[in-house]
Amino acid sequence: MAEGVFSGAIGIDLGTTYSCVATYESSVEIIANEQGNRVTPSFVAFTPEERLIGDAAKNQAALNPRNTVFDAKRLIGRRFDDESVQSDMKTWPFKVIDANGSPMIEVEYLGETKSFSPQEISAMVLTKMKEIAEAKIGKKVEKAVITVPAYFNDAQRQATKDAGAIAGLNVLRIINEPTAAAIAYGLGAGKSEKERHVLIFDLGGGTFDVSLLNIAGGVYTVKSTSGNTHLGGQDFDTNLLEHFKAEFKKKTGLDISGDARALRRLRTAAERAKRTLSSVTQTTVEVDSLFEGEDFETSITRARFEDINAALFKSTLEPVEQVLKDAQISKSQIDEVVLVGGSTRIPKVQKLLSDFFEGKQLEKSINPDEAVAYGAAVQAAILTGSNLSDDTKDLLLLDVAPLSLGVAMQGDVFACVIPRNTTVPTIKRRTFTTVHDGQTTVTFPVYQGERVNCKDNTLLGEFDLKGIPPLPAGEPVLEAIFEVDANGILKVTAVEKSTGKTANITISNAIGRLSSEDIEKMVSQAEEFKAADEAFAKRHEARQRLESYVSSIEQTVSDPVLSAKMKKGAKSKVEAALADAFSALQIEESSAEDYRKAEIGLKRVVTKAMATR
C-alpha cells in the first residue's frame, strides 16, 4: 500500500450477513473485495493456524462450524438474557457464553480457547472492509461513517461505534441504514426538484427498518421510523431449514439437530433455494451424504416457501402502518416506495407491499445490496468536506430518535422526556422532585422504549444525584436534561436547581458497555491478531517457495543429464543441503525466516555445484 493517509472517509454498511464498503471521490464507488465481490460475508472463522474473514471464512463454514462466527450484529449491544439472544443460540453452531450479563463468543483459535465480544467480531469485519478500501485507494484509511438499523437502540449504536474504534477507525458518524439508502435514491434514480414523501422499506439479512422521509431538494427529513432489529433473510432461511430437517427425518428417521456440519450444509442449501425461488417457481435441493451417509433430495415450490414464511412476510407490514400513523400521513400521500436490502427481492414481500399501497409500482431502481454503503459514502464525503459535487454540497440530513427516552418514576412508571421520532440532535428537559422528606439522593434509571411499565422497556443505565438539600418531599426541583447527538447516542444530566449540583451519564456504564480501557485493550489485541495473520501468510508463502524450489532441485539431481553438469563431488553436497531443507519443512514451528534461510542455503550450494567447471 502506498504511504500516506486518505484525507476523506469511507462509508461502511456493516450488515448481519453481508457488508459493503464505498468511497466518494467526485462520485461514489462501491469497492469490490479481492474475490471481485461487491459485498463481503460478515463471517469470521478461527482455525488452529489462522483467522479468516469474509468469503474465505464463509466458504469453510461447513468444515469448521463451531469456530465460524456470523450474526454478530444480532448480539451487539444486547444482554445475554435477551429473549432473541436465547432463541438465536439454539440455531447457532458456535458457543455463546454469559460474561457478567453480556454475551461472549467462545472459539478455539491457535490451539487455545478464546472468547470475543460481539464488538470484537464486528471490528474484525470492519477491519476487513477497511483493508478492501485501502487496497483500492492505495492509502491508509482512518475515518469512516458506519450504518446501523434505524431501529437500533442506544446500547446497539454505542457498541457499533466501539467496534469501529477497535478496528482503528475514527467513526465520524453512525447513520441509519434507510436514511443512507434514501440519499442513494435521491441522488440517483429519484433525483427531482419537487418535494415528495418517500417510504424506504429495508429488509436485509437480519434486520428490518421502515422509514418515511420528506425529500425536498437536498433536504432529507425523516418523519418517522419503525422496524424490527430481529427480522430478515436469516429467519426465512431458518424456517426453510426446519422444514427440510423435518422432511429428512420423515424420509430417513434421522434427526440432524445435533450435527453442526450437517446443519450448516443444509442451511447453505436452504439459502440457495430461497434465492433461486425469487426468479423461478420451483427448485430442487440436493445435499450428498448429508448425515450418516444418507443423501437429501427434495423439490420445493415458491408457493410452499411463501407458506412456510407467511407469518413473517405478513409481519413486515406492521411497521409500514406504524410509520404512516406516526407521521400522520395516509398511504395515498406516499409518492414512492423504495426497496432496499437483499430480502426485498422475494416476490411475495413485494406483492404484499404493493397490495398494501393499492397496487402501487415499487421503486427498484437502486441496488438493494449497495444503496446503504452508497449513502454512507456520501455522508462521509460531506463530513470530511471532500470533492463534493453540486448535488451533494447542499445535502442536509435530519434524522430522528427511533425510540422514546425517559426515566423511571415511582411505581416503575416510564416518564418520557424525548418522544420517539423527535428530530436529532435534540435537547429536552423535564422536572422531577423527591418522594420522601429529607431525601438527599435521587437515582435516575434511564430507559428507552414505548411501554408504560419500565420493566417492558430497555434499561440503558442509571446514575445518582447526591447532595440534595434535605427538604420536605416534593419541594426540591430536580431537572433532567436529555441530549441526543447526531449518532442517536444519549447523554443525560440532572441538576438540583437551588444548589446547582449536577450529575451526568453518557450512557456507557450499562451492561455490556465497553470502557475506554476495554476498547484500548481490544485495539491492541486486534493489532496482535492482524500481525499473527500477516506472519501466518508470510510463513505460508515462504514454505510454498521452499517446497517448489526443493522439488525442482530434486528433479535436477535425479535427472542424469542435468546432474552430470554438476562439479565433481558436488552432488553429495546438494543432496545434503536438500536433506537440510527437508528437515526445515518437517519442523512444525519453522518460521518464515527459517524457510527463507533454508532456501538461501540450498541455493548457495546449488549455484556452486552448477558453476562452470
UniProtKB/Swiss-Prot annotation:
Transmembrane segments: none
Motif annotated as Nuclear export signal, chain positions: 574-582
Molecular function (Gene Ontology), one example: heat shock protein binding
Chain intervals for the UniProt region annotation (Substrate binding domain (SBD)): 403-613
Subcellular location, record wording: Cytoplasm
Sites where the protein binds ATP: 16-18, 73, 205-207, 271-278, 342
Region span, Inter-domain linker: 392-402
GO process annotations (BP): chaperone cofactor-dependent protein refolding; protein refolding; translation
Entries under CDD domains matching the protein: ASKHA_NBD_HSP70_Ssb (cd24093)
Top-level taxon: Eukaryota
Reactions catalysed according to its record: ATP + H2O = ADP + phosphate + H(+)
Region (Nucleotide binding domain (NBD)): 1-391
UniProt-annotated stretches for the region Lid domain (SBDalpha): 516-612
Keywords linked to the UniProt accession: ATP-binding, Chaperone, Cytoplasm, Hydrolase, Nucleotide-binding, Protein biosynthesis
A single GO cellular-component term on record: cytoplasm
EC number assigned by the record: 3.6.4.10
Subunit structure: Binds to ribosomes. Binds close to the ribosomal tunnel exit via contacts with both ribosomal proteins and rRNA. Directly interacts with nascent polypeptides. This interaction is dependent on the ribosome-associated complex (RAC). Interacts with SSE1. Interacts with FES1.
Family membership: Belongs to the heat shock protein 70 family. Ssb-type Hsp70 subfamily.
Job description of the protein: Ribosome-bound, Hsp70-type chaperone that assists in the cotranslational folding of newly synthesized proteins in the cytosol. Stimulates folding by interacting with nascent chains, binding to short, largely hydrophobic sequences exposed by unfolded proteins, thereby stabilizing longer, more slowly translated, and aggregation-prone nascent polypeptides and domains that cannot fold stably until fully synthesized. The Hsp70-protein substrate interaction depends on ATP-binding and on allosteric regulation between the NBD and the SBD.
Name under which the protein is recorded: Ribosome-associated molecular chaperone SSB1
Species, as recorded: Eremothecium gossypii (strain ATCC 10895 / CBS 109.51 / FGSC 9923 / NRRL Y-1056)
